[in-house]
Amino acid sequence: MYAIIVTGGKQYKVEAGQAIYVEKLDAQAGDKVTFDKVVFVGGDDTKIGTPFVDGASVEGTVDKQGKEKKVVTFKYKPKKHTHTKQGHRQPYTKVTIDAINA
């Protein structure tokens, strides 16, 4: 059985026992999280939401909080001695899927 959930403005296809990286959630490592925005549940009994499946949820456990690799942006204007260097590290949350309730 698998499900498609929406979190952080993105859709993820998940199965029980799978670890996924999602946009930062306000939870600590070891906390339980529930995703209520389930768009699709597949398996023996397929359910399609309009836009979400009623009564369906996905439960998971937060493994860790972290930051991705640094992305460096560099802007310059030729012949003007003007340049700007900026870095960004996007925060993420690693979640292990425990159960799919449909």
From Swiss-Prot:
Gene Ontology, cellular component aspect: cytoplasm; ribonucleoprotein complex; ribosome
Keywords: Ribonucleoprotein, Ribosomal protein, RNA-binding, rRNA-binding
Domain of life: Bacteria
Pfam families: Ribosomal_L21p (PF00829)
InterPro entries membership: bL21-like, bL21-like_sf, Ribosomal_bL21, Ribosomal_bL21_CS
GO molecular function term, any single one: structural constituent of ribosome
The family this protein is said to belong to: Belongs to the bacterial ribosomal protein bL21 family.
Annotated protein name in UniProt: Large ribosomal subunit protein bL21
Organism: Limosilactobacillus fermentum (strain NBRC 3956 / LMG 18251)
Lineage, opening ranks: Bacteria, Bacillati, Bacillota, Bacilli, Lactobacillales
